[in-house]
């Protein structure tokens, strides 16, 4: 098939949650898309779909990509890995069918598509077969530190982005070796994160933000947060810029 007869794959960053933080380029891509694909868990259209809802054309085809599992199985369990691997292969096939038919497919991704985004799993499998574009989005971490009014780094400060899912030993080691940190994937890992921050002397300057930039957002010093599970959309920030003009 002629390459020019094929459709175009576009990864669209939808930003951290506030629809007003969508970029002009993202809005334009949504206005042009024949198909809009969005990842979600069972029983939900997903947050990315909610962010862009006002910009979807009535005639566009919606393609939900529904995760078979989320947090009910440990991510290191073989059953989880197998189910997710099969899911991404099936998702690639569904998207490729539309691309082969000559359609423009916009795949939504909260924050930025290439930063902890599920879109990446499609990108690496399809970018060598179809014309592809990635539209960057405002990341969740920048949305959260802007909302909190928290200067995060300056000068030679080192910023580490850490998943809360890593082991407590590794999390503590990396926190000890950085000036500033963003801890993502908080959820049920909050008690472990708190212990690691306390062990490294950083708990007092840690800020907890949930649902950053969204309508029902909340932020507070992490030391004041109850030690229960945090929502999926939550982040812990540790500023490196402390006590400096």
Where are these regions (language model features)?
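Class I S-adenosyl-L-methionine
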Residues: 2-19, 24-130, 214, 219-221, ...
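A contiguous loop/helix-start segment that scaffolds small-molecule binding in enzyme catalytic cores
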Residues: 9, 175-245
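General beta-strand structural signal in soluble alpha/beta enzymes
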Residues: 38-39, 63-64, 107-109, 134-137, ...
